[in-house]
Amino acid sequence: MKLRHLLLVLTSFAIAAGQPGSKAIVVNLDTAQWTREKGAANGSEGVMLRTDSATGGMDLLVRFPAGHVIPPHFHESNERIIVVEGQLTLHQDDGDAVVNAGGYAYLPAREVQRLSCTSKTRCGFYLSWDGKPESHPAK
């Protein structure tokens, strides 16, 4: 159920963002329009940064409360994560990887992932997909 909410949030942000042209895009965290979607966990919010009408790719900033877990899932396109605040743990079949603020993770398309905010404070991270971020639940 949480994954469905995440998918709804991502889709809603994508629709709200529209399709940028060839102009530069600048977003400052202190003035960004953070949005909380109905049904999302308390403290979960996001800001759509960019969508690509040709590829379906997108860039997104998200924040989740401490302890929040995103259940196992995979995407149809490659995903990049840069942790902006807090600590994110990436749980995979071959072990866990802790990504601290300033850290980076690359997840190839169709690789199963489970993410959790393992810091005592909220987690904030930048997400980028090079194609549509279609997400599918995994076991």
Residues covered by each model-derived region:
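Glycine- and acidic-residue-biased ligand/ion/polar-headgroup-sensing regions
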Residues: 65-68, 75-93
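Conserved short histidine dyad/triad with adjacent acidic residue
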Residues: 55-75, 108-110
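Short acidic-glycine-tyrosine-enriched beta hairpin
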Residues: 54, 93-112
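Ligand-binding loop in jelly-roll beta-barrel domains
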Residues: 44, 109-134
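A short, N-terminal "cap"/entry segment at the start of jelly-roll beta-barrel domains
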Residues: 16-56, 138-139
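Bacterial N-terminal signal peptides that target proteins for export
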Residues: 1-7
